[in-house]
From Swiss-Prot:
Gene behind this protein: nifA
NCBIfam families hit by this protein: nifA
Keyword Transmembrane: no
Ligand binding (a divalent metal cation): C498, C503
InterPro entries cross-referenced by the UniProt entry: AAA+_ATPase, GAF, GAF-like_dom_sf, HTH_Fis, Nif-specific_regulatory_prot, P-loop_NTPase, Sigma_54_int, Sigma_54_int_dom_ATP-bd_1
Up-regulation conditions: NifA transcriptional activity seems to be controlled by both the general nitrogen regulatory (ntr) system and the O(2)-regulatory (FNR) system.
GO biological process, one term: phosphorelay signal transduction system
The protein, known as: Nif-specific regulatory protein
Region annotation (Inter-domain linker) ranges: 485-572
Source organism (scientific name): Azorhizobium caulinodans (strain ATCC 43989 / DSM 5975 / JCM 20966 / LMG 6465 / NBRC 14845 / NCIMB 13405 / ORS 571)
Subunit comment: Interacts with sigma-54.
PROSITE patterns (UniProt xref): SIGMA54_INTERACT_1 (PS00675), SIGMA54_INTERACT_2 (PS00676), SIGMA54_INTERACT_3 (PS00688), SIGMA54_INTERACT_4 (PS50045)
Amino acid sequence: MPMTDAFQVRVPRVSSSTAGDIAASSITTRGALPRPGGMPVSMSRGTSPEVALIGVYEISKILTAPRRLEVTLANVVNVLSSMLQMRHGMICILDSEGDPDMVATTGWTPEMAGQIRAHVPQKAIDQIVATQMPLVVQDVTADPLFAGHEDLFGPPEEATVSFIGVPIKADHHVMGTLSIDRIWDGTARFRFDEDVRFLTMVANLVGQTVRLHKLVASDRDRLIAQTHRLEKALREEKSGAEPEVAEAANGSAMGIVGDSPLVKRLIATAQVVARSNSTVLLRGESGTGKELFARAIHELSPRKGKPFVKVNCAALPESVLESELFGHEKGAFTGALNMRQGRFELAHGGTLFLDEIGEITPAFQAKLLRVLQEGEFERVGGNRTLKVDVRLVCATNKNLEEAVSKGEFRADLYYRIHVVPLILPPLRERPGDIPKLAKNFLDRFNKENKLHMMLSAPAIDVLRRCYFPGNVRELENCIRRTATLAHDAVITPHDFACDSGQCLSAMLWKGSAPKPVMPHVPPAPTPLTPLSPAPLATAAPAAASPAPAADSLPVTCPGTEACPAVPPRQSEKEQLLQAMERSGWVQAKAARLLNLTPRQVGYALRKYDIDIKRF
């Protein structure tokens, strides 16, 4: 093996006894190494194949043990010090810039070992890294690579200090160096070639271990950083979402005003329904906020941020509705000058809200059914089939069950859209929300008109007692009309139209109760009077009837008796029919509404010869 050119440099020497003390301070075994069976192995000046094999075996056990890399490397150099006739040993792992990142040593005093990182022979290490070849220096005191590092190797004991360094490589990349130094007296007892081969084998094992440790450390750092990022994002999302969730729980985030139990349950159901892509059917009287709930479901769903497209099916004739929903090709009909996308295409990836779906004709129902079943359609005048991904929300105030029984509405379409029905209660069933709604509408009016009007407590009481057959929409109109015509900034009962006999509800429903339009949400405000047990001719005892809530006391609007807060009392048969329709023709549910037993309801059905509707 070629040696480096050297030149003599005089350095201070100390006694042999001192050098021996320094070397012995970190060498645990000198002269013999235990065999696996317990017998010692005699050490020679060179590294024999037997000793090398045992050394590789011992070092491989250290390298595969689950310890920190610093501890592992320190154990390796300690084993080397027990096997080789060496004074000092060093494993230096480099960082990406080529500077010492981790140094494990043996043979130095604790004081010197603590400063070794700042005194490593950097020039020698750089040459090993640059050439990727072992470096053997017979006399470090005479080699310029070690100039300035004489103190690092200690007193030479009247002999020459030699240096052997090999690169630590993995995947053809130098990751550091493994080096030792020893006393060389110039005789043939020292076989540098054998030591270089042995140290190269050890360095290769160390290189693989360092590479694995760095990969694990890199993955760990990446996972820790990713965890920190996710935790930070979660904290930010949680801090930003907590008010949003709280608002959604009471409906304010969705624009829904009301904190009655009915509204809270409906909002909670809407939040659950919004998570899926199931079709939703919103049912309720006109003015109960079906479009508001449809938009809320869209905003709470994963499709938030995608299009929300709405179509009023009752406002368009069939020919126009088909073109509106499916689009048309250029020249499909007179006036079709350009191709036009339909609402289904515009809502791709989002939500399509079909209001008043109960008003479409049976012929168009078949076309709509195909889109709901297959998710595909053709534009008017076209022959290319288009596929869309749309979440459908429908709404109606029509009795679809009755329409199905009369053949006015297809049963297959009914079952297709009646996947998740949400029944919106009329305003008269939640009078406790009226004050909050009224204040909300008045605040909007004030903001639009830059006013500061208020509702007096007696005025709120008047609103709570009114019937509002037009529900929330009528309440909003009432507030706007009253605020517009009020003479003062504070609205009083005398400012309402019913005080002067101009109540729209009284004019609309004068002398008769409104005709039920929904099987589940009747417009009549009168709570059902419990039917009497058989025979039904006698009234039920007063104790059997639940006391009406204060919110639903039968009072009339002030100033006129024509405003029917309570429409005329229904007959027992009408009450029974209404309860059955509200309960979906389930006798047990109807019995609970009437405060009767299912057996009594069954008797009443037979008495009045009422057939059970089945769908």
